[in-house]
Amino acid sequence: FIDMHVHLRDPGFEEKETIETGCRAAAHGGYTTILAMPNTKPVVDNPDVVNYVHNKAKTVGLVNVLQVGAVTKNQEGKELADIEGMVKAGIPAISEDGKSVMNAQLYREAMEKAAKLGIVVLAHCEDKNLVNGGVMNEDEHARELGLKGITNSVEDIIVARDIMLSHDTGAKLHLCHCSTEDSVMMVDLAKQKN
């Protein structure tokens, strides 16, 4: 049983979770393997941080911990992280976790590297430029509550882009948190084409 999206928060945010508490929770839930997201402090964007997590997880020893590497340095979306070095350290995937790389050319380069290195790209599809202060799905309930909504296009646009880049580069793509009808339709169509 594998959980592909956990937050161990170590290093840097141990007040939220530690590798040991996360592994204990996973084992208690019946999981044997977990993939840890890179949103730590420092961000998992180089082999040293990957090795830190893997070594600490081996000491805990309750479940297999596979560390996911960041796509960009410090998850800032400006420059690619040391993807090759992290692959040598054992990452199975890259992700910007919780955000999309908004620079499509940079993301394409990351996908090209991922395809060449045989790792998966885990994508959180959300166009941050369209979120515009929204806090929930834009619908009647949001209006009743007086809250700014987020349209489905925030997700759909990035899903379409990421599927096209995956097709162009040959990268293996896993979309995290798909929530719209059109996103699911695009995934189904992409599966039919490949």
Report the location of each language-model feature.
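Metal-associated gating/positioning segment near the N- to mid-region
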Residues: 1-60
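Glycine-/small-residue-rich active-site loops that bind phosphorylated ligands and cofactors
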Residues: 14, 41-45, 74-75, 99-102, ...
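Histidine/acidic residue-rich metal-binding segments in metalloenzymes
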Residues: 80-194
